[in-house]
């Protein structure tokens, strides 16, 4: 079957085998695990799942079932509640349908005909509202059929290696004011080995889930009385963040960035000038003060623009680099909130560079060097993608072309590889997205570098050039981590909670065997704190083994056990959990070791 053609590609458009008419411009897609093939297989598997659900729950009505990264889902309505325990039953029915080797066929009707055909299906009517006028394609397999643009595999025999992964709720059309539908997620591959490998990764991901580990490590919490998407940083989490912020602050200053702070609340007039009001309002929070509209900032750029405008600028001042740990708020629908990965309040390691056009390439390359240093420090591989003009954007095509080409030239001249995300740019300019790969080979979008000619024009920014003429600067928007929340969540999962020593909330656990050893433990803790190292003395009246297990569960990098011998000799029994070794050191030797651990990292 690996040599079977399941679809065709026409540039970036996929076409099913039924639509093939000997067009030599079409490229065959074979039954394998290529990106294009998996899209067709997973799309078809979503329909197979829907067919199985319809067979088991005849009253079921279906909304949409798209392919997503690593799988697919289907939103539908049933009378009874479907739980995780029901997935095996649905999978069994899917296997029966796959083994039946049903042909998958396509036919087309006018939109009016489809509307009449599904007159008694309100969810189909909802789908029709989202489809442009013209012919509507319907795919049919056995007794099941559904609206779909396709393409699909030609027969259900190709759908043998799948797994339904979870059940969730989803608002109709993502609208919190509409009804809640049932959503089942799944995945599929062309062979059993690839499926099993993926399922192993899923199981490992569950163990590494930052929400689970964050609770075990007492890093952060969420509270319904406070609200969804609003993380509460506990003491350990605050220490972790503080260490990360301190290291980044120093790294920015060494690279010539000036610390600034903009207000969190700005008049709506400022957001109207910037274009956020027209292009980003649905993602913002607004309020009234003294009968005037204000918006809570979703980005830090307007505040930095006003700081630029607070003084007369000369070409000699450029590039001018401002940075801040800016707290921003963005409206996210409750259904997409997910731990620290998707929140409504977060802090960006945000910077804006105001420079002359001739300095763009140099500044972009400097930022890329900064990115590389940071990613290597945390053990991340990464790749880059240039995101171009979206449908909803400000500025003319010429300005966008200049900005996009500036990014491409900077990457090309360094021989750096990158992909293109057509239409993925911010509304005010193209950007380079930094996508990191974690220990489970998952890709995460974190940092961005954006070239912006539009906001300097809208706010009439100026500098005086060498000929004493007024010129408009270019503005580079830049975040390397993206947000502290998201980056910390990714880092926790990447390290399975075993955070690098230099940012671990508690770096050393000090475990006195008995009450007689507490004073020595406190003495060590004080010495470590003077070095900027956080430790905790485990002084509860518990067994030695329980104290050590507690420290291990908290993922503390180093554990010191203190008994009579250690007190007498001014030594420590060290368990280095990262190096996976145990040894006895003098206290001075241990202090030297911790200093070396801290000095290993240079941003």
UniProtKB/Swiss-Prot annotation:
It is an enzyme of class 6 (ligase). One of its GO terms (biological process) is threonyl-tRNA aminoacylation. It is found in: Cytoplasm. It catalyses: tRNA(Thr) + L-threonine + ATP = L-threonyl-tRNA(Thr) + AMP + diphosphate + H(+). SMART domains: tRNA_SAD. The keyword Cell membrane does not apply. GO terms for molecular function: ATP binding; metal ion binding; threonine-tRNA ligase activity; tRNA binding. CDD domains: ThrRS_anticodon, ThrRS_core. The keyword Protein biosynthesis applies. GO terms for cellular component: cytosol. Residues 209-500 are annotated as: Catalytic. Its cofactor is Zn(2+). Zn(2+) binds at residues 301, 352, 477. Keywords: Aminoacyl-tRNA synthetase, ATP-binding, Cytoplasm, Ligase, Metal-binding, Nucleotide-binding, Protein biosynthesis, RNA-binding, tRNA-binding, Zinc. Its EC number is 6.1.1.3. Binds 1 zinc ion per subunit. It holds the Pfam family HGTP_anticodon. InterPro entries: aa-tRNA-synt_IIb, aa-tRNA-synth_II, aa-tRNA-synth_II/BPL/LPL, Anticodon-bd, Anticodon-bd_dom_sf, Thr-tRNA-ligase_IIa, Thr/Ala-tRNA-synth_IIc_edit, ThrRS_anticodon. Its main location: cytoplasm. Homodimer. HAMAP family: Thr_tRNA_synth. Belongs to the class-II aminoacyl-tRNA synthetase family. NCBIfam families: thrS (TIGR00418). Catalyzes the attachment of threonine to tRNA(Thr) in a two-step reaction: L-threonine is first activated by ATP to form Thr-AMP and then transferred to the acceptor end of tRNA(Thr). Also edits incorrectly charged L-seryl-tRNA(Thr). PANTHER family: THREONINE--TRNA LIGASE, CHLOROPLASTIC_MITOCHONDRIAL 2, THREONINE-TRNA LIGASE. This is Threonine--tRNA ligase.
